[in-house]
Amino acid sequence: MVMINFQHIDGEALLAQLQPLLGNIRGKLTPNVEMRKVTWFRTGGLAELFYQPVDEEDLALFLHNLPECVPVTIVGIGSNLLVRDGGVPGVVIRLSPKNFGQVQQVSSKGFLVGAGTADKHLAAAALKAEIAGFHFYHGIPGGLGGALKMNAGANGVETAARVVEVYALDRKGQRHILSLKDMHYSYRHCDIPEDFIFTAALLEGEPGNKDAIRAAMDEVALHRETVQPIREKTGGSTFKNPKDTSAWRVIDEAGCRGLQIGGAQMSEMHCNFMINTGQATGYDLEALGETVRARVFAHSAHLLQWEIERIGQFEQGRSVASFDPFH
């Protein structure tokens, strides 16, 4: 029986307990990995264990053999991710572009795409195949797994518009095939069981003209270059847009453009982008985000919701309270 204290990060001890139980897994299992090295913010504590499966079959075996008491956290490219300074207990599973980054054309307008595929690589593959409708991925700084989970979108198009089927594993390693209807998509959200791990998806666009597709991608790239701090350490859009306006607008109107806590700052260029100016901690970033939420609510009664995913536990004595005006 596995007896583990997940309040204290001790990857070596956890690895020693789990190795005899995991069977013939083929992926790389590493203790005490610095999460700052795998996130775009370049912040965060240790992953107690860090697993990189080689394929879906390997991941299924790992999940099947992993005791249910062990917490599991999934990461991909690490763009839309804030890792807290106290680290991530249990196992962090990363679906890498190397092992889950295939883009296979399966029809005149469709691709089978691995969840570890960078969005911009999907856009490039669609350009090469002259399949329209994927240009917006050229402007999303992330991977397909995250795009499927949050219904990522840009330039008026969302991931839901391209999905035919999504392939997932549950916490026990069982495979599931989800239709577009099964995903229950809404703005920056899908409603599926929390333990599901996306491994790939069947996506479809429309036959297109290469010059027109390239022009659409160039327009996306120019927009990003002009209005977003793409050369900074950032996680992309910090908050979801409210129903009746843009997040950046209410942030700006509340006087939060350029607001800074420690090494974290709301970008002067695009104030819905939070940046690490050099030495930010996870605490700095999350404290800044919650401060912005409070100021925006006080100014306009808009309650901003995080778009960036926050994982892990706080460092002892340095927790950040989530702003809640109703309690």
From Swiss-Prot:
Keyword Cell division: yes
Organism for this UniProt entry: Bartonella tribocorum (strain CIP 105476 / IBS 506)
Main location: cytoplasm
Top enzyme category: oxidoreductase
Enzymatic reactions: UDP-N-acetyl-alpha-D-muramate + NADP(+) = UDP-N-acetyl-3-O-(1-carboxyvinyl)-alpha-D-glucosamine + NADPH + H(+)
Alphabetical list of HAMAP family matching this protein: MurB
Keyword tags: Cell cycle, Cell division, Cell shape, Cell wall biogenesis/degradation, Cytoplasm, FAD, Flavoprotein, NADP, Oxidoreductase, Peptidoglycan synthesis
Family note: Belongs to the MurB family.
Biological classification of the source: Bacteria, Pseudomonadati, Pseudomonadota, Alphaproteobacteria, Hyphomicrobiales
Pathway(s) per entry: Cell wall biogenesis; peptidoglycan biosynthesis
Transferase recorded as keyword: no
Entry function: Cell wall formation.
GO molecular function term, any single one: UDP-N-acetylmuramate dehydrogenase activity
Residues of the FAD-binding PCMH-type domain: 42-223
Annotated active site: 188, 237, 307
Record localization: Cytoplasm
Cofactor: FAD
Name of the protein: UDP-N-acetylenolpyruvoylglucosamine reductase
